């Protein structure tokens, strides 16, 4: 007999859980931390006037926290543009070729900016400053390179303005993103509102991907030691056209309850 499963991402791996255990998928709203709880519990949210515990699957599966991933990305793009500016200055002072991109869509930051949108006003305010400054940085770089062929001295003067004004503005906004890495990560992740044994909870995931129909006979069992976790029991693995998907058999809600968490029975 076939069952419907929803596939979702946690880090580089895909997992699936039975659709009949999932109530809905929500963006992450304000999370209230709970002191002295197991670290796999991110906190609670108010869902239909009930408090639901949020289970951090990245922590459970020993995957780097998403806010740390975003902080690393923003630190990398800050370094990228520092290197870009230094290389540009050297190419001007030594009158040699500049080999890095002047296309603001092509760099690491540009690709991320093109793919990201937000309803968070604080992050949106940063992006309203960052997007035009970043675009101007690369475009002005190309303009200076074009001018250098006719007037090297004017190009060098423009380089000073590029560095002291436009780059500083870009760098300032990137630093703000680094400081807001946690907020950005919450904008990118989702919550699966789930129910098991009449107890409701939320799974924090990187994103939902697909619904698949699975015959139970297609699930390949896992070794007991690799499929066991204090909170999550893995049933096995299935192979899709894209990759392997780990099937979650159950969430250990009894263990959750034993930790004095605010689990909710809404039956």
PLM regions and their residue ranges:
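The feature marks the first
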Residues: 1-39, 61
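Extended intrinsically disordered, low-complexity coil regions enriched in Ser, Thr, Gly, Ala
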Residues: 60-68, 102, 150, 186-187, ...
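N-terminal membrane-sensor/transducer module of prokaryotic signaling receptors
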Residues: 64-188
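Short, structured motif recognition centered on aromatic/hydrophobic residues
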Residues: 15-17, 51-57, 202-203, 243-248
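Flexible, small-/acidic-enriched active-site or ligand-binding loops
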Residues: 24-41, 206-240
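Compact, glycine-rich, soluble single-domain proteins
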Residues: 41-44, 58, 193
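Positively charged
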Residues: 9-10, 20, 193-206
């Amino acid at each position: 007999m076939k069952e419907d499963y929803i596939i979702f991402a946690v880090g580089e791996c895909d997992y699936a859980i039975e659709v009949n255990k999932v109530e809905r998928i929500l963006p992450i709203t304000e999370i209230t931390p709970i002191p002295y709880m197991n670290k796999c519990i991110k906190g609670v949210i108010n869902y239909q006037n009930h408090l639901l515990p949020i289970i951090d699957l990245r922590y459970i599966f020993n995957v780097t926290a998403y806010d740390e991933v975003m902080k690393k990305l923003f630190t990398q793009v800050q370094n990228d543009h520092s290197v870009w500016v230094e290389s540009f200055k050297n190419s001007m002072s030594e009158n040699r070729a500049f080999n890095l991109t002047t296309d603001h869509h092509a760099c690491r930051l540009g690709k991320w900016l093109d793919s990201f949108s937000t309803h968070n006003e604080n992050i949106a305010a940063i992006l309203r400053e960052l997007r035009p400054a970043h675009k101007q940085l690369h475009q002005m770089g190309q303009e200076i390179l074009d001018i250098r062929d006719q007037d090297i001295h004017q190009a060098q003067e423009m380089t000073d303005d590029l560095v002291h004004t436009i780059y500083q503005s870009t760098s300032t906004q990137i630093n703000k993103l680094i400081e807001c890495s946690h907020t950005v990560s919450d904008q990118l992740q989702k919550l699966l509102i789930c129910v098991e044994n009449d107890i409701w909870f939320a799974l924090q995931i990187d994103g939902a991907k697909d619904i698949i129909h699975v015959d139970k006979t297609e699930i390949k069992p896992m070794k007991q030691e690799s499929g066991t976790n204090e909170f999550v029991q893995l049933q096995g693995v299935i192979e899709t056209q894209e990759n392997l998907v780990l099937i979650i058999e159950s969430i250990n809600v009894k263990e959750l309850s034993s930790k004095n968490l605010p689990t909710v029975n809404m039956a």
